[in-house]
Swiss-Prot record:
Keywords assigned by UniProt, alphabetized: Disulfide bond, Glycoprotein, Hydrolase, Protease, Signal, Thiol protease, Zymogen
Activity regulation description: Repressed by various protease inhibitors including p-chloromercuribenzene sulfonic acid (PCMBS), N-ethylmaleimide, kininogen, elastatinal, cystatin EW and leupeptin.
UniProt keyword Signal, yes or no: yes
Signal sequence region: 1-15
Residues of this chain annotated as glycosylated in UniProt: 300
Reactions accelerated catalytically: Hydrolysis of proteins and small molecule substrates at -Asn-|-Xaa- bonds
Gene: AEP1
Name assigned to this protein: Legumain
Length: 475
């Protein structure tokens, strides 16, 4: 039965360019000279941990190497990653991380700015704001940018309606993140900013709450109500090397990076990359096992050249500004099922290790059991609050485009804490239910009523280690 469930679920100060010699060579007659781009800064965030989430840290390490090749200085790139992959006992190439089946090592040289327990929302916010006094642990590196500087932020992980995951609780909540961006803008700490987000329902982080006047442009891997996808996975085309049991990358993430690596970024615009990534992430506009790449904020920035944010690699001088040669169709797995795919691969490859195979089967069983518990509990809570006739329509209601997930974000956090207190931790899978909690708030249910429903729905359930006392609250 478990097997059936699994198969079904299945400084940059690059400015003042010291590179004027080759800049002048590649400058086209019709292109204006732009030697004054300010300092390029970047924040790269892998919001997960565990070998089954290999792909998120691989994405971030790959992004770091791309920026370094583009001339962005290490001192101006801040990296958040748990750093439990490269030397993980399951990694077939110790000390090496790859983001493509035939790709090079992307781990070497990546700075350990914020790792392990230091990968937190609080540190992320402090880094973006350039507030060293609020940073706890880590290298202490922050985005100490000026009004003429440009900032690039890339985030790769699991997500849910209104939230982005972190390896250490709580989640990143949309309104908190937007508030940080508003503060950064108010401080005059940058000229323009570009943000790329890889996560399920990542459009919900910005839908209805992202202002257009912050000089910030955003693209997300998915809209406000759909999954994003892992790729380069075992058993798929193209597959990772045979010894790998986990996905190497994420569809949106590898799409933008492989696009940047194969084009002249002094000639390719932000808009051209958006169009290319949108097509590839949709699986050639079929949206069959693909997602809708969205854009938010100040879309005037899309006319700018990508080198202003990613830098420029001299090796790409003769590359085209844009073409459609990247692989258009990829086999993928949705982010939430990638965990099961990883465990199933481990199970299948343990035929000659009966004890290990039994242990992995127990892990799969517990994972599926907790997922079923979360799904069933949320549905039962809806029935208790609204009755069997209205429950589903209320919990799963999607607001019109342009409206935020929830009107009261404090209420959302409160409802999440009530649920986790009585029903156990949401985990990276349970993020999918954030819309239901938001709709509970939007419908005016009191905290007391929610508490009664959670007690009734989850009374007697033993979540084992998956309680907030062990994992921390998601809000």
């Amino acid at each position: 039965m478990v097997m059936m469930l699994v198969m079904l679920s299945l400084h940059g100060t690059a400015a003042r360019l010291n590179r004027r010699e080759w800049d002048s060579v590649i400058q086209l007659p019709t292109e204006p000279v732009d030697d004054e781009v300010g300092t390029r800064w970047a924040v790269l965030v892998a919001g997960s941990n565990g070998y089954g989430n290999y792909r998120h840290q691989a994405d971030v390490c790959h992004a770091y190497q791309l920026l370094i090749k583009g001339g962005v200085k290490e001192e101006n790139i801040v990296v958040f990653m748990y750093d439990d992959i490269a030397y993980n006992a399951m990694n077939p190439r110790p000390g090496v991380i790859i983001n493509h089946p035939q790709g090079p090592d992307v781990y070497a040289g990546v700075p350990k700015d914020y790792t392990g327990e230091d990968v937190t929302p609080e540190n992320l916010y402090a880094v973006i704001l350039g507030d060293k006094s609020k940073v706890k642990g880590g290298s202490g590196k922050v985005i100490n940018s000026n009004p003429e500087d440009r900032i690039f932020i890339f985030y790769s992980d699991h997500g849910g309606p209104g939230v982005l995951g972190m390896p250490n609780a709580p989640f990143v909540y949309a309104m908190d993140f937007i508030d940080v961006l508003k503060k950064k803008h108010a401080s005059g700490g940058y000229k323009e900013m570009v943000i790329y987000i890889e996560a399920c329902e990542s459009g919900s982080i910005f839908e209805g709450i992202m202002p257009k006047d912050l000089n910030i442009y955003v693209t997300t891997a998915s809209n406000a109500q759909e999954n994003s996808f892992g790729t380069y996975c075992p058993g798929m085309n193209p597959p990772p090397p045979e010894e790998y049991v986990t996905c190497l990358g994420d569809l949106y993430s590898v799409s933008w990076m492989e696009d940047s690596e194969t084009h002249n970024l002094k000639r390719e615009t932000v808009q051209q990359q958006y169009q290319s990534v949108r097509k590839r992430t949709s699986n050639s506009n079929s949206y069959r096992f693909g997602s809708h790449v969205m854009q938010y904020g100040d879309t005037n920035i899309t006319a700018e050249k990508l080198y202003l944010y990613h830098g420029f690699d001299p090796a790409t001088v003769n590359f085209p500004p844009h073409n459609g040669n990247l692989e258009a169709k990829m086999e993928v797995v949705n982010q939430r099922d990638a965990e099961l795919l990883f465990m199933w691969q481990m199970y299948q490859r343990s035929n000659h290790q009966p004890e290990k195979k039994t242990h992995i089967l127990e892990q799969i069983t517990e994972t599926v059991k907790h997922r079923n518990h979360l799904d069933g509990s949320v549905e039962l809570i809806g029935v208790l609050l609204y009755g069997p006739g209205k429950s589903s329509s209320v919990l799963h209601s999607v607001r019109a485009p342009g409206l935020p997930l929830v009107d009261d974000w404090t209420c959302l956090k409160s409802m999440v804490r009530v649920f986790e207190t009585h029903c156990g931790s949401l985990t990276q899978y349970g993020m999918k239910h954030m819309r239901a909690f938001g709709n509970v708030c939007n419908s005016g249910v009191s905290k007391a009523s929610m508490e009664e429903a959670c007690k009734a729905a989850c009374g007697g359930y033993d979540a084992g280690l998956l309680y907030p006392s062990n994992t921390g609250y998601s809000a």
